Amino acid sequence: MGRAFEYRRAAKEKRWDKMSKVFPKLAKAITVAAKEGGGDPAMNAKLRTAIANAKAQNMPKDNIDAAIKRASGKDGIFSEITYEGKAAYGVLIFIECTTDNPTRTIANIKSYFNKTPNASILTNGSIEFMFARKSAFEFRTDKNIEELELALIDYGLEELESRESEEGIYHIAYGDYKDFGRLSEGFEHLNIPISKAALQRIPTSPISLSETQMQDIEKLLDKIEDDDDVQAVYTNIE
C-alpha cells in the first residue's frame, strides 16, 4: 500500500509538471486570458496568474509577450471545451481543452480511448458532478503559516495543505472556483509569490488503485496529456 501510494503521488506530480512545462499549453492559457479580460496584466487577474505560471516554468518573456499579442489577432481565437470518459478499474476522466479546431480535438481524444481496452468517451455531464471545482494555489513562504491562513480566509480560502518535497515544504491553498480572482488578489496583497495556480476539479469520491493498475491507467493519461490541445486532465484516483 505504501509503495502504491508513493507511486500515485509521484505520478500526479509528474503529470502536473509535465503539463505545466509545455510552453504551447502555457501560451494558450495566456492568450485565452488576454482575449477574455484584455492584455493588461494589471487589470486582468486571470492573465496575471497565467503569466505567473509561465514564468514559474521559465517560459521566455518573448514567448509570453507573443502569446498576449496573439489575443488580438485572428489566430487568437480558441474554444474551451471539455470531454468526459471512463477507463478500467472504475477510473473516471475529465478533460479540459483549449483548441482552434474542435473537430480535430475530439477526433484525437476519441482515438486515445478507442485504442485503450475498457475505455470509452461518455456523454458530457455524465461525471462532471462527481468533481468539485476548486481554485488551487501552490506557494512557498517563510511567513507564519497560521497567520497567513487567517488572512487568506478573508479572500475565500477554504483549506490549506502543507506538503514536503525535495526542495522543502510547500503549501497549497484551496477555495471555491468562483473565488479564484479574490484569492489571487489576496496573495498579491500579502506579497506571497505563487508557484502554480489553476482551477482544479477534485473528485468527491476518490478511488484507490494498486501500483500495477496505476501504471496501466498512466498509459492512457499520458496519451491524453501529450495532446497539444489538452490543458488539464482530472481523474477520480486519490
Swiss-Prot record:
The UniProt similarity line reads: Belongs to the TACO1 family.
Q: Which GO terms describe its cellular component?
A: cytosol
Organism whose genome encodes this protein: Helicobacter hepaticus (strain ATCC 51449 / 3B1)
MF (Gene Ontology)? DNA binding
Q: Does the UniProt entry include the keyword GTP-binding?
A: no
InterPro entries to which the protein is assigned, alphabetical: Integrase-like_N, TACO1_YebC-like_2nd/3rd_dom, TACO1_YebC_N, Transcrip_reg_TACO1-like, Transcrip_reg_TACO1-like_dom3, YebC-like
Carries keyword S-adenosyl-L-methionine?
no
Q: What does the record list as GO biological process?
A: regulation of DNA-templated transcription
Compartments reported by the entry: Cytoplasm
Key words, A-Z = Cytoplasm, DNA-binding, Transcription, Transcription regulation
> Which cysteines form disulfides?
none
Q: What residue ranges are annotated as transmembrane?
A: none
What name does the UniProt record give this protein?
Probable transcriptional regulatory protein HH_1604
